[in-house]
Each structure stands twice: as C-alpha cells, then as structure tokens.
UniProtKB/Swiss-Prot annotation:
Belongs to the IlvD/Edd family. Keywords: 2Fe-2S, Amino-acid biosynthesis, Branched-chain amino acid biosynthesis, Iron, Iron-sulfur, Lyase, Magnesium, Metal-binding. [2Fe-2S] cluster binds at residues 120, 193. The modification N6-carboxylysine is found at residue 122. SUPFAM superfamilies: IlvD/EDD N-terminal domain-like, LeuD/IlvD-like. The active site is at residue 477. Its cofactor is [2Fe-2S] cluster; Mg(2+). Pathway: Amino-acid biosynthesis; L-isoleucine biosynthesis; L-isoleucine from 2-oxobutanoate: step 3/4; Amino-acid biosynthesis; L-valine biosynthesis; L-valine from pyruvate: step 3/4. The keyword Metal-binding applies. GO terms for cellular component: cytosol. It comes from Sulfurovum sp. (strain NBC37-1). This is Dihydroxy-acid dehydratase. The lineage of its organism: Bacteria, Pseudomonadati, Campylobacterota, Epsilonproteobacteria, Campylobacterales. It catalyses: (2R)-2,3-dihydroxy-3-methylbutanoate = 3-methyl-2-oxobutanoate + H2O; (2R,3R)-2,3-dihydroxy-3-methylpentanoate = (S)-3-methyl-2-oxopentanoate + H2O.
C-alpha cells in the first residue's frame, strides 16, 4: 500500500480522483507512486532563477521511470539582496515558512515521496526541516554552485569581493571604476554564490548527511554534469517509491538523517571551514530529527577534526569549482576517514550505499586545494563555540576566517543595531584595538537575527580586519571573515550581558581556549542588571511580531516553539 492511496483509492475517493483528473491524470496514473517535486524557483535569486527548467528535467525523468510528479514551490529570500536594510529581518524567518510549506503540501496531499530542489541560503535548511517532519523517502538535489568571477587581470573574485570592495572604496583604497569592475564580474552565471558561503556549505553537508547524491555540493550549475545529477536523483527517488514497503521504510528521511548523519555533517563542516550559519541550521535540523545535539558537541568535533580544505572567503583564490576538480566532498571524507573516527562511515545514504561504500574509491586529485590529513591548514576544525560571561549559552566564530591573532583584548564600542554600527564605522568611531559590539540583532531582538556582512566587510575593506574584533547576538554571512563572533546567547533582548556592555569595557576573546568574556566584576554586572531595560523595537509586521513571540535563541537553532 502506498501513502497516496489515501487520496486515490476506493469509491469514496471519487471526488479526489475527479480533481486529480482535472490536472491531467489518467486511469493508469492512480496505480503509480505520487512524487512531490518541492521546487524553490524564484527569479530574484541567481541560484534559483533557472530551477523551473531543472524541475522540468526532473519531472520528465520521474514520468519516464513510472511515477507521477507533482511540482510545488516554496518561497525564497536572497540574503545578498536583502543585506544592509530591513529586508534582512525576513531572511531567517523565511526558513520556518519554507519548512511549514513543505510539511503542509506533502501531508495535505499524502504524497509518497519527495525530491527537493533547494540551492541558497535559508531554503536548504528549511526544506530539510520540512522533509524531516513529513518523514517520507526524500532525495535532495540542489541547483548547484556558481562559477567564480574574474577581474580583467584574471584574479578570481566572488560576491564577498564586492562587499569588501565597498569598504575599500570608502577608505579610498580603490577607485569607483575598480568597484564597478568587481560588481560586473563577481557573479558570472547562475548558481549559489561560488565560495564556501552558507548555501554551498549546506549543499556540501547534505552529501555528508547522505540525503543528496555525490557531487551535490560542488558540480557547477548550468552544466551537462549537473543535469545528469538531476536525472540520477529523479531515477533514485522513483526506485525507492516503487519498492516494497519494507524497502521504502529504510529510506524514510529520519532513517537517513539520524544522529550519526548530524555528526558527520558537523565533521565535514569543520574539515571544510563552512559558514557559521551551519551551526544555527544544523541545530534546528537536529531538533526536527529529534537528535540530541548541542553546542558542546560541536567543540568536541572541532577539537578532533582537522581543517583540510580552505575555500573563499577564508582563501579567496579557491572556489567550489576548484574543490570539484580536486576530488569533491567524497575525497574530503575519504581523507578524513584515514584518521578513524573523524567520519562515521557505516551510516546509510539515500543511494542505498553506506557512507563508506560511497567514498571508498574517492581520492584527492590536487593536494594544493584539498590538503591531506598529515598536512592540514589547521589541526582543529574551522568553527568553534566560545563561552564565558558574555556567552553563557555559547557564541560562534568561524576560525577558518580569522586573519589576525587568535586571542584579542580590546575596548568595547557598542551599537544597538546594525544600522548604527555601519554609521559608526563609516564615521571613524571604530579604531584599532576596539571590539565592535552590535546587539539587539538576535532572533528576538532584531527580530530575525540579521547577517552582519556589511559591517564586517567595511571593517575588512578599511584595513581594520586584523586590528578589531566584532561580537553580536546577530549572525554573519558565509562570506564574512575576520575575528567575527556571532550568535551570542543569551541575546540582549533576553537580558544577556551583551546588552549591559558600555563603551570602554574591556573584552577578551581567546579562540584556542574557547573564551569570550567581559572584564567586569560580579558587582558591576549586578548593578547594571538592576538598571537594565532591554530595547524593544517597534514592529509593524504581523509576521515578525509572531516570529519574535515564538522564536528561541541561537543556542537552540532559533527554532519556533509554541507553548
């Protein structure tokens, strides 16, 4: 029996079949599995504007393999376009809408299985979260990464180059013509932005989790190789959907994305220096999978796993196409396996192979791009969780992106919003030796936990990247580099110490010892708490008010929880 029989079998389902016939179904179709094709086509996003054509390829392959496809769409937000204005308030909340929409369509219509087509930003984790709720066999196949851009002299560039170029222009380091050259060359094609930013980090981690096919994270969009990957994914979901019930059970989403899959995802994240946003999203995914996983587990993995692949923004000359040419994610995992427990190789994957079977023949083809385990970029992973009185519940730093010292002590310069911070940086308020504090930008305080790419890019572009640190209860773009610490929990809106800081306070961070603290006495903190009144930003948006009321803090993945 198929799940879809609930809407298509029996005399009492004649009205249901009548409606389905109106969409073009014939008698013979009611004996076939119904496959949801969860697309995220939107013309605004470079990684998504071509996904309508991708869906046609996939649907044709599904029909050719004896199943019935039903395409539906989720929404999408382009973080790059939403950056630097109040549009960014909607980015993280869109993850919840996407998850809800997947759950709604799949469960309302009792579809048997799903193939999901995400690519960028919050769309990937949102679709994964929704798929975990539905818990039917699901294959993920992303649109694919964008090719790197190049300046006229051949220097590789990407979107992060342009954001930092704005800071360089503000500082008088480059001309308007050079900035225009960056603008016109950074994004040369469709696809998810070409570095190891959030989109490509998540698309890569799906390979580690076993829910996508090999090559998902690195094969370029709009290439024949990518088209073949779409077809393979479509064929695979049909094989599963047409199999016996016991076989289908093996490939339910939660049977693939289990605790070991979550641990493998974080291990690969550490090895490849993924975006700090992966912490937020993987914590949320773990909650949907009912996997017990927390920030302390991340540090344990980080201490164990070496960083062996460095990609833009951490290494600006290397992009996803280079990782693909050097052997792809499978070669990274194969190299990690040489040290034993870095990767859990017995876990199942959606292709029916164990992870070991998937990676056993993979090899690094260019050790200048993907290093060996004996010659890592760093002996520890590319992300770390810091603790201290400023982050009692944790804060996240992308250690792979640090350009200066790994320990820093400086004086606080405090801003109650990202806009205030940008104005302060541009006006010269931020000096070498400062710690820029941007607060009331957390999940509740923002609300929506804005990305701080504009202030971090200005800091880098103005030559302060290794001279200042930045801490925030907001988050960062995957394109951020430097001593940037986000996800500070508890956030200012919850009464966290970040909200009590004052200009001139001494702040100390030590990445290697996982410390983030303000040099304040217990008495000073208690006195400030007595006087503290959190800033509550006025909101016209009904959706953002709902979000603020339900969202948890970053240490919980910023998921929504109702009473």
């Amino acid at each position: 029996m198929m799940r879809s029989d609930e809407i298509k079998k029996g005399y009492n389902r004649a009205p249901h079949r009548s409606l389905l016939r109106a969409t073009g179904l014939k008698d013979e179709d009611f004996d076939k599995p119904f496959i949801g094709v969860a697309n995220s086509f939107i013309e605004l996003i470079p990684g998504h504007y071509f996904l309508n054509k991708v869906a046609e390829v996939i649907k044709n392959e599904i029909r050719a393999n004896g199943c019935v496809p039903f395409e539906f769409n989720t929404i999408g937000v382009d973080d790059g376009i939403a950056m630097g204005h109040d549009g960014m308030l909607y980015s993280l909340p869109s993850r919840e809408i996407i998850a809800n929409s997947i759950e709604t369509v799949m469960n309302a219509h009792k579809l048997d299985a799903m193939i999901a087509i995400p690519n960028c930003d919050k769309i990937v984790p949102g679709m994964i979260m929704g798929a975990l709720r539905v818990d039917v066999p699901t294959v993920f196949v992303s649109g694919g990464p964008m090719a790197a851009g190049h300046m006229d002299d051949g220097t590789p560039i990407d979107l992060a180059t342009v954001f930092e170029g704005v800071g360089e222009y503000e500082a008088g380091e480059i001309t308007e013509e050079t900035l225009a050259e960056m603008e016109c060359n950074a994004c040369p094609s469709g696809g998810s932005c070409s570095g190891m930013f959030t989109a490509n980090s998540m698309n890569t981690l799906m390979e580690a989790m076993g829910i996508a096919l090999p090559g998902n994270g690195t094969i370029l969009a709009l290439t024949p190789e990518r088209t073949e990957l779409y077809k393979k994914a479509a064929r695979r979901i049909c094989e599963i959907a047409k199999s016996e019930a016991a076989e289908r059970e093996k490939f339910r989403m939660r049977n693939i994305l289990n605790e070991n899959a979550v641990r493998n995802a974080f291990a690969v994240d550490m090895a490849m220096g993924g975006s700090s946003n992966t912490v937020l999203h993987m914590l949320a995914i773990a909650k949907e999978a009912e996997v017990d996983f927390n920030l302390e587990d991340i540090n344990m993995i980080s201490k164990r796993v070496s960083h062996i692949a460095k990609i833009s923004p951490s290494l600006t000359t290397v992009h996803m196409e280079d990782i693909n040419t050097a052997g792809g994610v499978s070669s990274v995992m194969h190299e990690m396996h040489k040290r034993g427990d870095d990767i859990l190789i017995d876990n199942p994957t959606i292709t029916g192979e164990s992870l070991y079977e998937r990676i056993k023949d993979a090899r690094i083809l260019d050790t200048n791009i993907i290093h060996t385990i004996d010659n890592p970029f760093s002996e520890v992973g590319g992300l770390a969780i810091l603790y201290g009185n400023l982050a009692e519940q944790g804060a996240v730093i992308k250690t792979a992106g640090i350009t200066g010292d790994r320990a820093f002590t400086g004086t606080a310069v405090c801003f109650d919003s990202q806009d205030e911070a940008i104005e302060g940086i541009l006006s010269g308020k931020v000096k070498a030796g400062n710690v820029v504090v941007i607060r009331y930008e957390g999940p509740k305080g923002g609300p929506g936990m804005q990305e701080m790419l504009s202030p971090t890019s200005l800091i880098m572009g103005m030559g302060l990247g290794d001279k200042v640190a930045l801490i925030t209860d907001g988050r960062f773009s995957g394109a951020t580099r430097g001593a940037s610490i986000g996800h500070v929990s508890p956030e200012a809106a919850e009464g966290g110490l970040i909200g009590l800081l004052e200009d001139g306070d001494e702040i100390h961070l030590d990445v290697d010892n996982y410390i983030l603290e303000a040099k304040l006495t217990f008495e000073e903190i208690a006195e400030r708490k007595d006087k503290f009144k959190p800033v509550v930003k006025p909101l016209k948006s009904k959706w953002l008010r709902q979000y603020r009321a339900l969202v948890t803090n970053a240490s919980n993945g910023a998921v929504l929880e109702a009473e």
